[in-house]
Amino acid sequence: MRIGYGYDSHAFAENRKLILSGIEIPYELGLKGHSDADAVIHALIDSILGALALGDIGSHFPDNDSKYKGISSIVLLEKTVSIMEEKNYEISNTDITIILEKPKLRNYIDTMRENLSKILKTDIENVSIKAKTNEKMDSIGRGEGIAVHCVSLLKKTK
């Protein structure tokens, strides 16, 4: 068993879609970033790579590489899952906390969990997602962006 921790944050931006866990969430703002800026998937990727002691998302998918400009983070997660499988590991479980003031995610959590479980090739019961506010404190509390924390436990397949 190996455990990894991931974190990501992005500022909100106009004229962008809000993509979280590969799902488009209706909102007037999206997240600023080189790719689709899916902070949930980015934190998840970092937790998997961290568990494998293989660095972080930027070392595998650099934001100064034009081939990743606007890319769906689902593609990056699929590549990360392939790396994990090549190392003979699979997800035991992952626990994700999304911190933002708006929009409220309650109605999207189950769809987000289902989408991630398919990409991770694991049962939905192994994927936990929670959404919290920052109680109006700091830049996230002022609604300027989002932060995501993720911990993943990997188990050997062989």
Swiss-Prot record:
Binds 1 divalent metal cation per subunit. Its EC number is 4.6.1.12. InterPro entries: MECDP_synthase, MECDP_synthase_CS, MECDP_synthase_sf. It catalyses: 4-CDP-2-C-methyl-D-erythritol 2-phosphate = 2-C-methyl-D-erythritol 2,4-cyclic diphosphate + CMP. Pathway: Isoprenoid biosynthesis; isopentenyl diphosphate biosynthesis via DXP pathway; isopentenyl diphosphate from 1-deoxy-D-xylulose 5-phosphate: step 4/6. The record marks H34, T133 as: Transition state stabilizer. Keywords: Isoprene biosynthesis, Lyase, Metal-binding. The keyword Chloroplast does not apply. One of its GO terms (molecular function) is metal ion binding. It comes from the Bacteria. Coiled coil: none annotated. This is 2-C-methyl-D-erythritol 2,4-cyclodiphosphate synthase. A divalent metal cation binds at D8, H10, H42. Signal peptide: none annotated. It is an enzyme of class 4 (lyase). Its cofactor is a divalent metal cation. Pfam families: YgbB. Involved in the biosynthesis of isopentenyl diphosphate (IPP) and dimethylallyl diphosphate (DMAPP), two major building blocks of isoprenoid compounds. Catalyzes the conversion of 4-diphosphocytidyl-2-C-methyl-D-erythritol 2-phosphate (CDP-ME2P) to 2-C-methyl-D-erythritol 2,4-cyclodiphosphate (ME-CPP) with a corresponding release of cytidine 5-monophosphate (CMP). Homotrimer. GO terms for biological process: isopentenyl diphosphate biosynthetic process, methylerythritol 4-phosphate pathway; terpenoid biosynthetic process. 4-CDP-2-C-methyl-D-erythritol 2-phosphate binds at D8, S9, H10, H34, S35, D56, I57, G58, F61, P62, D63, N64, D65, R142. Belongs to the IspF family.
